[in-house]
């Protein structure tokens, strides 16, 4: 992937963010997601590449666009695999809450783990703690290690955890160490990536979230040099979600076996979830969040705030883009 393609990848998430932001705060999460999907696919199909969706909106019979296995792009040029979430945090967008964004990971062919639509136990931490914290250790042990790596007392650490019933015991354990909890209602990708940057006030992400988003987070953290591990969750008793009300542990294990996953308890490192030679992460804010602002609509323009990370040349770019409207008369700098 060259610099031109990386710029075009940035434009993919910008267009998706703008599209879904038109419905931000209107309580229409499915409609906002559909607009983002359409905008993302439209921009992808304008790019000279042989693109393929490996993580998308669902299986081919479940999603009309950006389904798993769908080919995107013009059909000529480099082969690129994509893991996409056109509107991460649909509820956040629908109710104009912080943290919704359009996001994707891209890599050369075969460079992204084809994660099943399961849940995943995740651990994200700053580069200083890479390889020292471990998802197999208790939260108490990891907070002690994190404290030593960052030179901060436990009560100076902030741990992000999704606000779910399944995390009740985890939250109790974290609080017993003295560390602070920052609960989030949806969308853990931005929280995971924030752990890779100093000064965000976010030091660690713990808990269970969606597996596909784990791959996207891993791509970003690999490029940042941060720590990310994931472990698939297949037991409904652990996931504790109504979405799995009709599923069984045995049935989920059988499904994983059908997908070729022979070790369902394997702990995946970031370099295994995003193993490509060249890995790119791109995200654009729909609503304001930890890392960037959301879309701003003005009289003569629309403003987007985005982030793109590439391991090709170890770059991380925060980009504020002004999308001028036809006939624009005056554009303010800020």
Curated annotation (Swiss-Prot):
Q: Which reaction does it catalyse?
A: beta-D-fructose 1,6-bisphosphate + H2O = beta-D-fructose 6-phosphate + phosphate; D-sedoheptulose 1,7-bisphosphate + H2O = D-sedoheptulose 7-phosphate + phosphate
Q: Pfam families from the xrefs?
A: FBPase_glpX
- Keyword terms, alphabetized: Calvin cycle, Carbohydrate metabolism, Hydrolase, Manganese, Metal-binding
Q: Which cofactor does it need?
A: Mn(2+)
Biological process terms from the Gene Ontology for this record are:
fructose 1,6-bisphosphate metabolic process; gluconeogenesis; glycerol metabolic process; reductive pentose-phosphate cycle
Gene Ontology CC terms: cytosol
Residues annotated for Mn(2+) 2 binding in this entry: 85, 88, 213
* UniProt-annotated binding residues for substrate: 88-90, 119, 164-166, 186-188
**Any idea which positions bind Mn(2+) 1?**
33, 57
Instruction: List the InterPro entries.
Output: FBPase_class-2/SBPase (IPR004464)
Task: Enumerate the GO terms in the molecular function aspect.
Answer: fructose 1,6-bisphosphate 1-phosphatase activity; metal ion binding; sedoheptulose-bisphosphatase activity
- The EC number(s) given in the record are 3.1.3.11, 3.1.3.37
Query: Part of which pathway?
Result: Carbohydrate biosynthesis; Calvin cycle
Q: State its role.
A: Catalyzes the hydrolysis of fructose 1,6-bisphosphate (Fru 1,6-P2) and sedoheptulose 1,7-bisphosphate (Sed 1,7-P2) to fructose 6-phosphate and sedoheptulose 7-phosphate, respectively.
Q: Identify its protein family.
A: Belongs to the FBPase class 2 family.
Q: How does it assemble?
A: Homotetramer.
Name of the protein described by the UniProt record = D-fructose 1,6-bisphosphatase class 2/sedoheptulose 1,7-bisphosphatase
């Amino acid at each position: 992937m060259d610099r031109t393609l990386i710029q075009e990848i940035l434009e993919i998430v910008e267009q998706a963010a703008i599209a879904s932001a038109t419905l931000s705060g209107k309580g229409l999460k499915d409609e906002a997601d559909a607009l983002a999907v359409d905008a993302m696919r439209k921009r992808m199909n304008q790019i000279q590449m042989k693109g393929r969706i490996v993580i998308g909106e669902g299986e081919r019979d479940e999603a009309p666009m950006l389904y798993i296995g769908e080919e995107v792009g013009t059909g000529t040029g480099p082969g690129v695999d994509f893991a996409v979430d056109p509107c991460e945090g649909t509820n956040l967008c629908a109710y104009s809450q912080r943290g919704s964004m359009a996001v994707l990971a891209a890599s050369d062919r075969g460079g992204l783990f084809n994660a099943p639509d399961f849940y995943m136990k995740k651990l994200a931490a700053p580069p200083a703690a890479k390889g020292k914290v471990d998802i197999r250790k208790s939260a108490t042990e990891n907070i002690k290690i994190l404290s030593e790596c960052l030179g901060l007392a436990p009560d100076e650490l902030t741990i992000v955890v999704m606000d779910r019933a399944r995390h009740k015991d985890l939250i109790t354990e974290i609080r017993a160490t003295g560390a602070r909890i920052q609960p989030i209602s949806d969308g853990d990708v931005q929280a995971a990536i924030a752990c890779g940057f100093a000064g965000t006030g976010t030091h660690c992400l713990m808990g269970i979230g969606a597996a596909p988003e784990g791959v996207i987070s891993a791509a970003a953290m690999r490029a940042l040099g941060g720590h990310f591990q994931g472990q698939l969750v297949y037991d409904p008793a652990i996931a504790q979600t109504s979405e799995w009300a009709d599923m069984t542990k045995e049935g989920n294990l059988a499904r994983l076996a059908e997908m070729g996953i022979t070790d369902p308890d394997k702990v995946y490192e970031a370099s295994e979830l995003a193993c490509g030679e060249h890995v790119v992460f791109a995200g654009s804010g729909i609503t304001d969040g930890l890392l960037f602002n959301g879309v701003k609509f003005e009289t003569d323009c629309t403003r987007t705030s985005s982030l793109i990370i590439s391991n090709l040349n170890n770059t991380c770019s925060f980009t504020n883009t002004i999308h001028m409207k036809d006939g624009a008369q005056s554009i303010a700098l800020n």
